[in-house]
């Protein structure tokens, strides 16, 4: 007995002794709690509350769940989950709280009402995805599982999952929507978590029914380096991981085969093949120019960055839309086609011009409304004129945008625009102090005014002009009456009220100055009914000379006055004028004597002059004669608050010039470098020079000698040092070294010979092995016995594959063809021509498997550039010969010291040169051997080809071995399942004996979906595989699909109109994989309505205990249902009409039928076919002849329409599918439904699911609740 078994028995004995525990202290007792109490407990997050709520949710019925959802229970859970995920998992308690919270969300989604409620709101799935932003791997695993289940649950769930990933990408500032999945997959080493991530990828890819959508989603993952990660994951020995990997590879192979079939043999996943096909298609047409232009434009788009990604996605959408419009654009012009391409469903976005028009109109309306309330002073309306609108010449916005409001006066607008100068500078810089929407300014002398709204600005005082208009080319026109203060700098006293509309306004640049209203300032006419706007757009007359006394207009100033008619209060913005030149009068309180010393400053806040001169201000009264003048004592202030004066330094005697301690004739930089060079030897200068004289290279390497050659003394330095006659001790260290070096005869030649001898040894050590390796690689290719045999095998296979084409009947091929063996894909997943060749070689020519040994020398020589190493050796030999010539002409001491050393280096270099000559000869032989051009053959490229082929060869061998091991494991799993099936106890009829409760079991949606995912999407693949085989020989019905009567509509006493017995083997052979069984429990009578049913048991979730644990080991998909009728009950006890199964009954068993309303009807579950459709009448007749089956099956009516049962996950969840997407079924429990068959697309089956009112239910009372457990098959 193992330790683990002993511990389990001890725990079991202890539990039996203690007896059943009434409650778990870690869970709140909410067995009979109402939804309101659970909602209140949710507002106090704790592990106890969440655990109790989970149990209540699992044991709840449909009505309770609906009340819980309607009272925002799911909202509270998701908000709590997002809040918990946001604060991290610094403590274990936080991690446990997150886990219990996500378990409650999973319990909600396990019910049909919960998952439908979540799918009804886009925000719920988005909130769920935000829980991924946590470091708790367990929480992320559960969230990913829920997203995967949503993907395969329904098309709506798949779309919401993709939307949630897009939302998560935006919230977390990621570049791609699948980045969160791929980053977790690449960084995690937790195998169960990796399996979950792969299941999410498979669910996202297999979710859509459209083939191109699946291929596009798969391409997105492949673009994020998914294939590289899968290659690494295949090395992990995990059964669940291998299931997901096989599911991905099988689906990928099937989709690629289908795409290639509908694309005329073009591999749509290969960029090169798609482009080659497209170029061949348009190369002989004018469209090739457009294609080239498009490609040139795409070259400028960067794929990185947020903007680049959006541009590529937008271009993809445009191309997809162009494909849709291609068949309907014959009679359209280019403009119409572009407009249709760029059209967007829904309300179009307004253009910038429309936005400007709208803003102008809105401002006008607001200004009119505010004017009617705020204007209290009557305004002047000149006789013969109309109220004025906001002039486009004076508006800071666009002239074009303002033209909408002044359309009634086109002539005035045209004249106003022509008066503008062409180069119009932006006006925003000249009006920084104005409100965001300044009103038009009063324009004097307008000829064609329009009725305007008044400005919404604070009311300015009239007649207070601030500055003159900006200087136009002509001077401003004369003003018939003098404008009060129109040309002054300082504001004059304000005139008596009421304010006049045409006084002293300045237009913003660049419009020219405008004339004022004639005689509008002299009198005060009665107020007009509507208040006019002071500004108006005039038509400037020919400009006469300026009036006498008028100041020429200064340059444009940053501000101007804005007169208004409200309350006589003025807000003035004047230009800053410097009065220090004496051009203007200075008040007495500003007349101070300048200080003679530099004074300390008083940190005050200076008031602007225009503010300080207000007539009611304190500062304005200082200039009146009645104010007494106060004069401070400036002298005392100057003494106290001046900076102390610096005392001049007394001239001191100049110090005597010191004699320098050292004498140097070198510049500072060279002296520093030489000192650094000498310090590395850690010895005296005499020792260094003695080593140079003796030729000792023990402390000199090549780099040191190269540095010494650069630091040798120059000609002028040598002359200065030789002319120095004083003591050498006065020289610096560097100069002393040079003096010692000059005493050595022929010191430059000695240093050069030392460097050549050391350098030659290094060159020989580096170049000689490479040259020898290249020579060996050439010889190995020329002498290999396996390479010609392998190439002969490839030649025969290639002639077989290319038979009948221009590439067939070949006598040989380029050696680079070996790299293309992996480009020829087989029908089997992950098997190429090279894989198959190696399998054949392993069977018939096992010696060829050692070819990688023959290719090892070329692989090692790959990357060696023969030309570079040859040139380096030749240059070194040339330097050696030159040094030998110099030594032979030198003194005998140098000859004796270096002649032999140089001769030995020269001989070694010449030997190396002979190796290069041999390499050149082998190159010519290799070019002749491989049928290559000797002038074009590159040894480096040839060796690189051999290295790449050797790597492919070795990898293919390993992959073949791994694939065999995986196939062996899969076979062992099948045998294990078969043995378990054989060990299952059976009754006398050969049917498995059922155990467990006799109550109806409700399907847990999420658990059933995840069980199918863990099995590798078996139901989905079964449905698709069966649909592909059946669709090829089926004739689509011409009549529209119609709902048929349920199979139970026949008279129960008469049985069915089909044969009562069928050969079981024949039926199984007809559809070997078309039927999946949902194992039923032992039938028991249904309780009557008068009796109280047993309380509903807790719906256990596989989050805590896998639901497969509740099944007996004999429950397998191959079991046959027991005879009789199997009525099916929904979650709330609503039973559908029973359905009989005549095709799967053993011989001699007749079908019995009971009415659905009979309370004694047997309960159970029935045999299902995931996403099944029946054969057409014609095909049924043909198949009936070969298999002796009746033309009308149990799931069909007389018209041949399919009424066979579907998967529970397809039918029991009514909102899960639309009428278009119907081929994905991923559940275990099944419910019969009325269904039709439609023909759509490429003859692939489609189901039409009726609405709820087409299903026939037999409702039970709420008191009769079935005992529910999760049945996962």
From Swiss-Prot:
Phenotype upon changing residue 1019 to A: Strongly inhibits depolymerization
Cell location: Cytoplasm, Perinuclear region
Activity regulation as described: Phosphate inhibits both the depolymerization and severing activities.
CDD domains to which the protein is assigned, alphabetical: WH2_INF2
Domain WH2: 1007-1022
Keyword Zinc included in the entry's annotation: no
Compositional bias per record (Polar residues), positions renumbered to this chain: 1047-1059
Domain FH2 per the UniProt entry, residue ranges: 589-979
Cellular-component GO terms for this entry: perinuclear region of cytoplasm
Protein family: Belongs to the formin homology family.
Protein's name in the database: Inverted formin-2
Origin species: Mus musculus
Upper lineage: Eukaryota, Metazoa, Chordata, Craniata, Vertebrata
Gene name, Swiss-Prot/TrEMBL: Inf2
């Amino acid at each position: 007995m193992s330790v683990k078994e002993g511990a389990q028995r001890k725990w079991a004995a202890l539990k039996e002794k203690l007896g059943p525990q009434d409650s778990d202290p870690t869970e709140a007792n909410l067995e009979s709690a109402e939804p309101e109490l659970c909602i209140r407990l949710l507002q106090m997050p704790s592990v106890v509350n969440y655990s109790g709520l989970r149990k209540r949710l699992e044991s709840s019925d449909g009505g309770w769940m609906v009340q819980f959802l309607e009272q925002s229970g799911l909202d509270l859970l998701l908000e709590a989950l997002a809040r918990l995920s946001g604060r991290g998992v610094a403590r274990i308690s936080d991690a446990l709280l997150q886990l219990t919270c996500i378990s409650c969300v999973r319990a909600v989604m396990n019910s049909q009402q919960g998952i439908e409620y979540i799918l009804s709101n886009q925000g719920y799935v988005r909130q769920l995805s935000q829980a991924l932003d946590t470091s708790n791997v367990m929480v992320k695993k559960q969230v990913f599982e829920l997203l995967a289940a949503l993907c395969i649950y329904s098309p709506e769930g798949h779309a919401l999952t993709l939307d949630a990933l897009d939302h998560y990408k935006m919230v977390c500032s990621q570049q791609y929507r699948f980045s969160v999945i791929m980053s977790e997959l690449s960084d995690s080493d937790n195998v169960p978590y990796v399996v979950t991530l792969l299941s999410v990828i498979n669910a996202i890819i297999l979710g859509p029914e459209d083939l191109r959508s699946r291929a596009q989603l798969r391409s997105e993952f492949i673009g994020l380096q998914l294939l590289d990660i899968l290659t690494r994951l295949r090395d992990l020995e995990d059964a669940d991981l291998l299931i997901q990997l096989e599911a991905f590879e099988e689906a990928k192979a099937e989709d690629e085969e289908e795409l290639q079939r509908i694309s005329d043999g073009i591999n749509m996943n290969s960029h090169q093949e798609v482009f080659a096909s497209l170029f061949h298609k348009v190369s002989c047409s004018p469209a090739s120019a457009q294609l080239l232009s498009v490609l040139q434009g795409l070259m400028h788009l960067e794929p990185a960055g947020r903007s680049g990604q959006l541009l590529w996605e937008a271009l993809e959408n445009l191309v997809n839309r162009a494909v849709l419009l291609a068949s309907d654009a014959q009679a359209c012009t280019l403009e119409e086609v572009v407009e249709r391409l760029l059209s967007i469903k829904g309300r179009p976005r307004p253009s910038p011009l429309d936005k400007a028009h709208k803003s102008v109109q809105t401002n006008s309306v607001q200004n009119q409304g505010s004017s009617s309330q705020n204007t209290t002073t009557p305004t002047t309306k000149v006789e013969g004129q109309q109220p004025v609108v906001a002039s486009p010449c004076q508006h800071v916005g666009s002239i074009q945008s303002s033209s909408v409001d002044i359309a009634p006066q086109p002539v005035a607008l045209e004249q106003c625009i022509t008066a503008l100068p062409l180069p119009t500078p932006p006006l925003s810089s000249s009006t920084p102090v104005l409100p965001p929407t300044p009103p038009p300014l009063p324009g004097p002398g307008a000829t064609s005014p329009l009725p305007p709204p008044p400005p919404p600005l604070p009311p300015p005082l009239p007649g207070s002009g601030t500055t003159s208009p900006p200087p136009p080319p002509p001077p401003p026109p004369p003003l018939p009456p003098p404008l009060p203060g129109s040309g002054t700098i300082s504001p004059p006293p304000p005139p008596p009220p009421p304010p006049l509309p045409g006084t002293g306004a300045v237009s913003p640049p660049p419009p020219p100055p405008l004339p004022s209203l004639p005689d509008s300032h002299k009198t005060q006419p009665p107020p007009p009914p509507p208040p006019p706007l002071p500004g108006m757009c005039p038509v400037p007359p020919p400009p006469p000379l300026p009036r006498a006394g008028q100041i020429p207009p200064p340059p444009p100033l940053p501000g101007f006055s804005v007169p208004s008619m409200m309350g006589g209060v003025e807000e003035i913005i004047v230009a800053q004028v410097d009065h220090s030149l004496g051009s203007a009068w200075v008040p007495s309180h500003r007349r101070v004597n300048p200080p003679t010393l530099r004074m300390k400053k008083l940190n005050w806040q200076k008031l602007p002059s225009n503010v300080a001169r207000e007539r009611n201000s304190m500062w304005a009264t200082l200039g009146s004669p009645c104010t007494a003048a106060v004069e401070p004592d400036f002298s005392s202030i100057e003494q106290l608050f001046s900076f102390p004066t610096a005392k001049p330094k007394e001239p001191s005697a100049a110090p005597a010039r010191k004699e320098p301690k050292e004498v140097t004739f070198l510049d500072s930089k060279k002296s520093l470098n030489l000192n650094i060079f000498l310090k590395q030897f850690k010895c005296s200068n005499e020792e260094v020079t003695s080593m140079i004289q003796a030729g000792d290279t023990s402390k000199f390497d090549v780099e040191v000698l190269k540095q010494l050659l650069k630091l040798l003394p120059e000609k002028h330095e040598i002359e200065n040092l030789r002319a120095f006659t004083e003591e050498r001790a006065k020289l610096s260290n560097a100069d002393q070294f040079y003096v010692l070096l000059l005493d050595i005869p022929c010191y430059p030649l000695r240093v050069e010979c030392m460097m050549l001898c050391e350098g030659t040894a290094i060159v020989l050590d580096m170049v000689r092995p490479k040259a020898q390796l290249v020579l060996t690689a050439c010889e190995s290719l020329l002498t290999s016995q396996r390479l010609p045999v392998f190439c002969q095998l490839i030649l025969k296979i290639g002639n077989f594959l290319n038979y009948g084409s221009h590439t067939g009947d070949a006598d040989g091929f380029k050696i680079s063809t070996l790299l293309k063996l992996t480009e020829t894909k087989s029908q089997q997943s992950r098997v190429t021509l090279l894989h198959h060749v190696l399998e054949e070689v392993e069977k018939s020519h096992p010696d060829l498997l050692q070819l990688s040994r023959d290719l090892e020398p070329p692989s090692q020589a790959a990357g060696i550039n023969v030309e570079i190493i040859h040139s380096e050796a030749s240059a070194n030999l040339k330097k050696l010969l030159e040094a030998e010539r110099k030594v032979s002409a030198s003194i005998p001491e140098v000859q004796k010291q270096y002649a032999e050393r140089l001769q030995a280096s020269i001989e070694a270099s010449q030997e190396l040169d002979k190796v290069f000559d041999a390499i050149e000869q082998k190159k010519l032989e290799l070019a002749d051997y491989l049928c290559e051009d000797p002038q074009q053959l590159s040894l480096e490229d040839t060796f690189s080809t051999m290295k790449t082929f050797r790597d492919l060869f070795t990898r293919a061998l390993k992959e073949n071995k791994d694939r065999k091991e995986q196939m062996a494991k899969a076979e062992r799993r099948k045998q294990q399942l078969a043995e378990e099936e054989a060990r299952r106890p059976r009754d006398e009829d050969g049917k498995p004996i059922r155990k467990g409760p006799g109550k109806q079991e409700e399907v847990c949606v999420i658990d059933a979906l995840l069980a199918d995912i863990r099995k590798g999407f078996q139901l989905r693949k079964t449905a698709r595989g069966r649909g592909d085989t059946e669709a090829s020989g089926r004739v689509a019905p011409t009549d529209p699909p119609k709902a048929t009567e349920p199979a139970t509509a026949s008279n129960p006493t008469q049985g069915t109109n089909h044969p009562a017995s069928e050969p079981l083997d024949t039926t199984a052979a007809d559809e070997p994989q078309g039927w999946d069984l949902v194992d039923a429990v032992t039938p028991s009578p249904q309780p009557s309505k008068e009796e109280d049913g047993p309380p509903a048991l807790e719906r256990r979730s596989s989050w805590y205990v896998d639901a497969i644990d509740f099944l007996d080991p004999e429950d397998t998909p191959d079991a046959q249902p027991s005879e009789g009728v199997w009525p099916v009950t929904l979650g709330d006890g609503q039973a559908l009409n029973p359905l009989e199964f005549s095709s799967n009954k053993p011989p001699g068993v007749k079908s019995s039928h009971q009415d659905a309303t009979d309370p004694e009807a047997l309960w159970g579950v029935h045999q299902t076919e995931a996403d099944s459709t029946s054969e057409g009448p014609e095909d049924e007749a043909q198949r009936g002849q070969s298999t002796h089956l009746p033309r009308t099956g149990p799931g069909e009516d007389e018209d041949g329409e399919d009424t066979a049962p579907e998967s529970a996950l397809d039918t029991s969840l009514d909102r899960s599918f639309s009428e278009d997407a119907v081929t994905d079924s991923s559940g275990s429990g099944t419910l019969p439904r009325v269904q039709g068959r439609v023909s759509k697309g490429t003859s692939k089956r489609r189901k039409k699911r009726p609405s709820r009112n087409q299903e026939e239910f037999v409702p039970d009372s709420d008191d009769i609740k079935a005992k529910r457990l999760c049945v996962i098959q």
